[in-house]
Amino acid sequence: GVSLLRSIHHHMKIGLIDVDGHGMKKKRGAMIYPNLALSKIAAYHRCIGDTVEWYDPLFCDGYDKVYMSKVFSFYEYHVRAKEIVKGGTGYDIHSQLPVEIDNMQPDFSIYENVPTDTSYGFLTRGCPNKCFWCVVPRKEGAIRPYWDVDKVANGRKKLVLMDNNILAAGDYAIAQLDKIIVRGYRIDFNQALDARLVTDEFALRLAKIKWIHSRIRFGCDTTVQIKECKRAMDLIHSYGFHGEFFLYTMIGGKNGF
């Protein structure tokens, strides 16, 4: 296991680059949310005794390995190191973390601006929809269970959940929402929910959940979804929700606003 690897491993100096987060900002870390892949990579390498830090071009000859993660394809970043690993949809939509790294609890301490009382992660991966603007179905495939909410929480009470379509997970989603309610987690599904999937069974639970900023997010990407969003919001209100709704929209494109 990891403990055996640590004992025989030649300790390395690891550099991390959050291309989206560092490219346009002076501060260290993500613009808004931490990069989950880099947080897991940091946890893995620290676990086997490596030194992990943000890549500093002034010391570029001192790195044994540099990981570059890019979600979007807008930025380019040039580095020098003995070994460079590039990952994320900005480089290759099919890139994935090795299983032994993906199973690690992320180390958010690499980010100076991430709240220590908040955890970030996914309950599911994938999505059954095939929206023309989205790479998730091509990258991750059909919806499937990923991590239990208690594993994501890892002792924290605030959770930012980045699932692309949690409600499409059916009974698994119901079970996870029930656990969120029982545990008293305060959550945010920051990639939004699919209003078309909101049934009475879901609405009852969504109304009971403690939401960060008392806000539920929905995707209203096209004009045809306006009616479904209104239906879902009215249904959740009918079960006693008194917070606010946040709708994502797309400007331009097929059926866009």
Question: What are these regions, as identified by a protein language model?
Answer:
Residues 8-11, 58-64, 78-81, 114-115, ...:
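Flexible, charged surface loops at secondary-structure boundaries
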Residues 16-19, 67-71, 135-232, 243-253:
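Core AdoMet radical
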Residues 29-52, 130-134, 185-193, 216-223:
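Acidic/glycine-enriched edge-of-secondary-structure segments
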Residues 80-82, 135, 233-240:
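Surface-exposed amphipathic alpha-helices with a cationic face
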Residues 45, 180, 236-240:
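Hydrophobic positions in alpha-helices of CheY-like receiver
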Residues 255-257:
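Catalytic cores of alpha/beta
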Residues 1-86, 91-93:
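A short, structured N-terminal alpha-helical element that caps or precedes a catalytic domain
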Residues 5, 12-13, 21-23, 76, ...:
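N-terminal [4Fe-4S]-dependent radical SAM core
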